Design a protein with these regions (language model features):
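Short, solvent-exposed linear motifs at loop/edge-of-secondary-structure regions
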Residues: 89-105, 283-293, 315-321
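Short Fe-S-cluster ligation motifs
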Residues: 130-159
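Conserved AdoMet/S-adenosylmethionine-binding subsite of the radical SAM
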Residues: 148-313, 321
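Short Gly/Ser/Thr- and Asp/Glu-enriched loop/turn motifs at secondary-structure junctions
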Residues: 92, 160-162, 334-338
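Short, acidic Gly/Pro/Ser/Thr-rich loop/turn segments
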Residues: 104-107, 224, 296, 349
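C-terminal accessory extensions appended to soluble enzyme cores
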Residues: 39-42, 46, 50-55, 310, ...
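Hydrophobic, Leu/Ile/Phe/Ala-enriched alpha-helical segments that form helix-helix packing faces
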Residues: 134, 138, 142, 247-250, ...
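Flexible, acidic/Gly-rich N-terminal and inter-domain linker regions that tether
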Residues: 2-110, 114-119, 123-136, 140, ...
Length: 376
């Protein structure tokens, strides 16, 4: 009886989502979880196989960790991500993860990740388990660097206990119902949190008991028309209104705020767009603004073209035009990442004092047997 009721509840939820969408939703992937005595809504097996092929380490039912390009560069060649230049982040101590790698309420044209599941099953994985398993996964993904003569031993050992958690890998992390608890645990373990959100769930941000060390909001559209064309809400026609609520909420949040503009040539970089971006930025009053160029890679190649990829000079031109309109200046830039930092002054991100420590026997995640790719 309980199982039937739960299944009906889930299917009813998806039916409601389908009513808000112009496209039908696929079948929910259900599996019995003997540990909890209930049904778990698992990740789409085809998507999971693709993510594993791309070297994601899946954590729990919907979470995941993947080694950042700049983490590898820091270990092998002592090169730093632009976050190192802008905020003092040591790339080899940064863990890139998401509690929901497979779900998002938008389908942005510029997103280079694999398309997400077309269901929104909120995940409530235990936050301490998520943290421990993510660190174990990070150690597994970095394990091969330990035997590389090009990697300094000291840096490799430092990388085993991350100091920064970039909650930005894939999906929309504010769909994780225990996000606040997770970030609190990160801070208590002496780690910063850098949360990236699309800003369409303002109530989640408003109700967070623990805020991230640094909150990034993707401000990729200067107006509703561009938002609908570029960010492509899946179900909610009022997503732009929710996004504007987030913009107006940001000044009240007691944490570091970054508005990030992903720039696409011929899409959102005109002088008119810059003026509209400035209006949004002035309402948000962030500590920093990042102007970052779209890169023609991955799934985004199905939506955009090489011509939409701005040069670094294009990024600087945009930034130099925007900065005076928001009473800020261009503080720094990174040509390899095609990004410029706009703000009033550079202030390194503060690392919290550790109150808790990882268990000595935390260890490393075991190798994962990857799922075979499923041909559509």
């Amino acid at each position: 009886m309980f199982l039937n009721t739960l299944i009906k509840t889930v299917l009813f939820k998806n039916k409601n989502l389908e009513a808000q969408s112009s496209e039908p939703l696929p079948t929910v992937h259900q599996q019995w979880n003997p540990a909890t005595g209930g049904i778990t809504m698992g990740m789409d097996p085809a998507l999971k196989a693709k993510l594993q092929k791309q070297r994601y380490h899946i954590v729990g039912e919907h979470g995941g960790v993947k080694t950042c390009h700049w983490t590898k560069e820091s270990l092998l060649r002592d090169r730093a991500c632009y976050k190192g230049t802008f905020y003092g982040v040591k790339s080899h101590t940064c863990m890139q993860m998401s509690p929901v790698v497979d779900q998002c309420n938008l389908a942005c044209t510029y997103c280079w990740r694999e398309p997400h599941m077309d269901t929104l099953e909120l995940t409530d994985q235990d936050p301490l388990e998520l943290l421990y398993e993510s660190v174990r996964a990070q150690r597994r993904l970095l394990s091969g660097f330990g035997g590389n003569d090009k990697v300094p031993r000291e840096k490799f050992l430092e990388a085993q206990d991350p100091k920064h958690v970039a909650i930005s890998l894939n999906g929309e992390p504010t769909l994780y119902t225990r996000l606040s608890e997770y970030m609190d645990l990160c801070h208590k373990h002496g780690m910063t949190t850098m949360l990236v959100t699309n800003g369409t769930l303002p109530k989640v941000l408003e109700n967070l008991d623990t805020l991230p060390t640094q909150l990034y909001v993707s401000v990729d559209a200067p107006n509703k028309q561009v938002f609908d064309d570029v960010c492509r809400p899946k179900w909610n026609s009022g997503a732009w209104d929710q996004f504007e609520k987030t913009i107006d909420l940001l000044p009240s949040l007691d944490t570091r705020i970054v508005c990030r503009h992903t720039l696409m040539k011929g899409v959102n970089m005109s002088s008119t767009h810059i003026k509209e971006f400035a209006e949004l930025d002035n309402r948000a009053d962030p500590d920093f603004i990042e102007a970052k160029g779209y890169v023609y890679v991955g799934h985004s190649r199905e939506n955009l073209s090489m011509e939409n990829m701005p040069s670094h000079d294009d990024i600087l031109s945009f930034s130099n035009e925007l900065a005076p309109q928001v009473n800020r200046e261009v503080l720094s830039e990174s040509r390899p990442s095609r990004v410029a930092l706009i703000g009033r002054e550079i202030v390194p991100i503060p690392i919290p004092e550790a109150e808790l420590y990882f268990p000595e026997d935390l260890g490393i995640a075991p190798p994962v047997k990857k799922l075979p790719l499923i041909q559509n």
